[in-house]
């Protein structure tokens, strides 16, 4: 997933109706693999914290389990990112090895009991706004299939993609209700903090895009699509939701 990037619906639009999937296939070509989108959790949560985040100063020295690009962004903001296996998160958070952790969202976080190890539950998940899961297929095996059987695989992956985000929407709201009953302190990151993280994210992504030609192609395609699709998201989904707050 790309920090401050596309939502699940925007990502699917880019993959299926932009050139996202073609570029994905191009990236995997030399590995003799065929990728297919096969799931998405939707926007995740920002994480569980044992310290309040009131300003960018609170990010300095923050020990947080957050891998990948999000971890690089946190490091540049003054924090210390940790990469921990899921089985290590609860104990590390409870004992103070880390101050905070991101995992997924209410449904998965409840299963891990993270509300018993941290005081504050922050949103939004700026680091994973629309993480696309993949089904990876051996290219030779895929090419040896008939067109009909290839279509069956493609359609099954697309069905799994749609099913997962629908499933998460259903299970997340139920888990959120549970957290509210448990009096979990659900808080929004301050705009100052999100603005700083967004600025750093842009720097990180731009640096990555300059590493090689293929990275530049993916970056340019992704960012151009995001630039064009976001205005519609803001006046459609966001416009509707904000119209009766």
Please provide the spans of the model-predicted regions.
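N-terminal secretory/targeting leader peptides
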Residues: 1-11, 23-245
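Core domains of carbohydrate- and sulfate-ester-processing enzymes
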Residues: 15-23
